[in-house]
Amino acid sequence: MRLPGVAKSTNREWSLQQRAIFEAFRSAPGHVLVRARAGTGKTTTILEALQYAPESKILLGAFNKQIADELQTRVNDPRVQAKTLHALGMGYIRAQVDDVRVDANNRAWDLVKDVADDAPQAIKIALKNLHTKVRELNPWAETTSDVERIAIAYDLVPDEAELRGKWTEGTYYETVLTILEHAADEVEVIDFADMIFLPLRRGWAWPVADLVVVDEAQDMTGPQLEIALRACRKDGRIVIVGDDRQAIYGFRGAASDGLNRLKARLEAVELGLTTTYRCGKAIVEVARALVPDFQAAPTAPEGTVRTAPLSAWMEAQPGDFVLSRVNAPLMGVALGLIRQGKRARIRGRDIGKGLVELVNKLKLSRLEDLDGALEQWSRREIARLSKKDQAVARTRIAQIMDNVDTLLTLAETVASVAELQRKLETLFSDEGASESVVMCSTIHRAKGLEAGRVWVLEDTLKGGNLEEENLRYVAVTRAKDELVLVTKNYVAPEGGEQ
């Protein structure tokens, strides 16, 4: 039974799985986990399900503001408020602090100057970046070990050359803890990180909804999920929606087993949404080797899957995706496509910015010095990381080598350091899927997107653990009609290449 006055969807035939979800929203006595696979109509299903919920105040938590705004325009129900969890946190802060002001540009820097104004400039910059990241990922940080783990994972350990006088790694981490205490006290001016940090650190998060629905839960950090759970009234319900097999942001603080841990904590009933309306049947079969419950819609086209030699990516056309686990191979692909006269970009403007900062850090006078400078820098960084927790350091070492390979690949096509920097600024873009450009992207950056034809650089993928398998699943399920697996191990079928 629908609620009185709620608009009824028309001309839509819902699946058995979708109807089970609607019934759970209507009558399930406790919390619910909806495990929704790639391209299964998750958003449409949840918006329809909300119409069955009897609660009078519903919070729909979204991953980012763009998604929250889109959801709010589609809800058309006064009981439902779609917002990011940062916006939820901001509401908690406004309730506690009169005339609070957001200053995203100066807040983090001002906190450093208040606590450590006598620090060398390089240390101040490092402190600013690290205390911001700790506020985002561990509002409850109490020990230097809590801080160090985040510093290593995000390349926020200062260079040995920057640690002088009283500044050791130990004092650096202790200072971050002092800044956190100061940030919790000075709350009249805040930034984005404070919107999660302050409600949790100060205990300001309280129940505001009878039903809390968290979308894309597998991508949320622990603190984001915690603030969502605290928003639910004691006798209310929580619905967690996500795909554990799209959990690929472990480096960003989203745990790969986060959905299962939430299910256990909430003692939630689980429902599945496993039929994809995106991928052709042949593509689904590839994905099923990784995720057995993944299914093609009965009306899905057959789709095409083929393997191809390494040079095949040169056939990519505007509108296609070329996906890799890491950035370095994408540089060669993008440059090769541009030489053919095709528009190509590498997704991730911030990646290009980071590489420009690395080039500046190397202080090169000649392009010929790049190779040696990168070798010295990478050896120094890896040697330092070898003394740290290896589970954390391993990811950072891989990033270091990817940065080195990316810069060396681009350097082969330019004549000066200045030209290298200019190309980095123009090649990397936040442009999304477009019919006018070949989008070269890491798998992480392509999550949530789709294309008719997707080229996957197979040899960049690793095996051996769940998150690596998840990356392959995400890559494969970006393709709607054609999936091309590019590999050096390609063997042409008898009678010639396919």
Q: Where are each of the predicted segments found?
A:
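Conserved P-loop NTPase-based nucleic-acid remodeling module centered on helicase motor cores
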Residues: 57, 65-135, 338-341, 345-355
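Accessory N-terminal region flanking or inserted into the helicase ATPase core
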Residues: 2-24, 31-33, 45, 121-213, ...
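P-loop NTPase Walker
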Residues: 2-99
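ATPase/helicase motor core of nucleic-acid motors
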Residues: 264-265, 314-320, 329-425
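Interdomain motor-coupling "hinge/lid" segment immediately C-terminal to the ATP-binding subdomain
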Residues: 96-185, 262-263, 269-313, 319, ...
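C-terminal accessory regions
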Residues: 401-498
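Catalytic glutamate of the conserved HExxH
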Residues: 216-219, 478-479
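Conserved helicase motor core of SF1/SF2 NTP-dependent helicases
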Residues: 35-47, 52, 63-66, 86, ...
